[in-house]
Amino acid sequence: LPKTKIGVDVNNDFKPSYNTIKGKGEVIKQLKEASKKADKIYLASDPDREGESIAWHIANTLKLDHNEKNRIEFNEITEKAIKEAVKNPRKINISRVNSQQARRILDRLVGYEISPFLWKLISPNTSAGRVQSVALKIICELEDKIKSFVPEKYWDVKGIFDGQYNLNLYKIDDKKIDKLKDEKLLERVKKDLKKKYEVISSKVSNKIKNPPLPLKTSTLQQLASSYLGFSASKTMMVAQKLYEGISINGEHKGLITYMRTDSTRISEEAKEMARKYITKEYGKEYLGSVSPKTKKNDKNVQDAHEGVRPTDINLTPQKIMEFLDKDQFKLYNLIWQRFLISQLAAMKYEQFEYILEKDKIQYRGSINKIIFDGYYKVFKEEEDLPIGDFPEIKEGDKFTLDKLDIKEDYTKPPARLTESSLVKTLESEGIGRPSTYASIIDTLKKREYVELQNKSFVPTEIGYEVKTQLDKFFPNIMNIKFTAKLEDELDEVDSGDKDWIDLLKTFYTELQKYEEKCKASVEKELEKLVESDIIGKDGKPLIMKIGRFGRYLTSQDEDSKENISLKGIEISLEEIKSGKIYVKDKIEELLKKKEGEKTDIILENGARLILKYGRFGAYLESEKFKEDNVRKTIPKDIKTKIENNTIKRENGILCLKEIFEKIEAENAAILKKAGKCEKCGKPFEIKNGRWGKFLACTGYPECKNIKKIEKK
């Protein structure tokens, strides 16, 4: 479709106008010349809707007979798979082609019909997207929940019985306690210190932990994001190369199956290959179920594709490491390991659970004993089960509550979405398909509707505004269920159960209704002036406008260059609708925040540490930073307390001295216990990493020794 115009004739059954992509004319010329010399032509594009559409376009370009069986497809680029595909050619699936055409035209209609309204309301650089706008809405609504979240104090309570059994508070008055928020109940718990509790239940249960399913596109992207730090687009780019193949000892080998799939199905041949490998490497007892379970709610599965797996399990990551670059090795290792794990036996274990009670207060403990390690032999889940010997405890036994371990904390707002969790959310809502997840995320980032903070999505001001206006004027486009229903209807077109032109007509008719309503509303909206409580040099209130970088204040005199950015200033939609915004105090407060807040920590040179905020949140900086260059990081838990406003202030000064003295004392004890580096003899230092604090040798980079900090 052309880049500069809609390219769809809405008055002629939505007939698309296809153009040759710039620079690809020579490729078409070569294809035509080669086709004249060929005895037989096979169309072997990717085995999905996009691939089917490409095959159809090539067939049209080469003037091939659509009734001829010239379409072949395979899920892996191996000699055997290709030969098998050539033996079983088929006709081009026109229903699948129409499904892909309908998707592209739907996206065009939304983009070209709705975006002009956004240009008028917000800025010429904005645009609407059928699926990306719904993804933006999900991110914005989550941010609203985070902003409106009010932390609640709670207590995590553990009881230490007879000096050795560490049990969690379980129930009070037959109600399960997840987070204890009632201070009266806490006092009631404290009263039972040094009292006897009786074991009212002790039982052993047999448990099974099944291995995870084979990978599909969404779970591949999620795992690559979580474990490797790959973006969705990077994951697909590296996977594409592994699928296309690598030269290994002079032989070209496709290493993985097709990576755009929403199926976790595995072929019988691949299962048998895995069974032979597992029997040889681990023994027959480690063989998994012949027919491992698949998810029942995989409603979005388009076809009979396999999950993502290695083409040959015998090509272990270690065997082919030298032929892969760093990223290829990481991703292949992930895919290979997950496939192996999925075909291994379940882990079997016994769980001993016991409950102690006194006066309707219960504590619960559990310990696990692995009976058969199964897939745990190769891979243990991050949240490992507590493993140990079963204590000799039976019903009727009595234990003394020696000590209470009470930790005060505050409830946390919902976590922002990462690339991994956004893909998971889109999939669970039925929005998008394997081929679109990466492009949805890329579009949001390129349009600057979202930004990444600590690998999590935060909507930008311009993103919020786009979401707000689309929600207001085109609620159907922004409706998650409506978007998911469209995806289902596209699947129906693919299966031949729905006519693609009927689908487009229904959609476009409804879209036009909203457009008509929108035109009049937009004109009224544009006539409105939103004044601020700041008076400009001309004596008139500055007015709010929206530009490339979000909201800003400007003079009512068009020739004036008086502008004030509103970045970081929260303005409610109610204020904007009222035509008057109050931002003067907020701007002053923001300026104060940039200047910093005094703390009670004084350095040896007499300089005071100032609390400041940067790209990664709060940090401490000397008020004489230009002279002494002193800057300190703030531990994550302390940052949270600062954000929740739970650290005391005296005479306008933030009291952090006592907290940091305690941390420094703890760190000194850790370093004393650690001693010198056993490799080079130099002292250790404490560093903060992705998983928390760790010990690192000060001899770095010559000595790269690191150690975990032993828990007390």
What are these model-predicted stretches?
Residues 243-257, 447-455:
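A short, conserved structural fragment
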Residues 80-159, 205:
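C-terminal or mid-to-C-terminal helical accessory/interaction module adjacent to the motor/catalytic core
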Residues 30, 34, 53-61, 81-85, ...:
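Alpha-helical scaffold elements adjacent to nucleotide-binding pockets in ATP/GTP-utilizing enzyme cores
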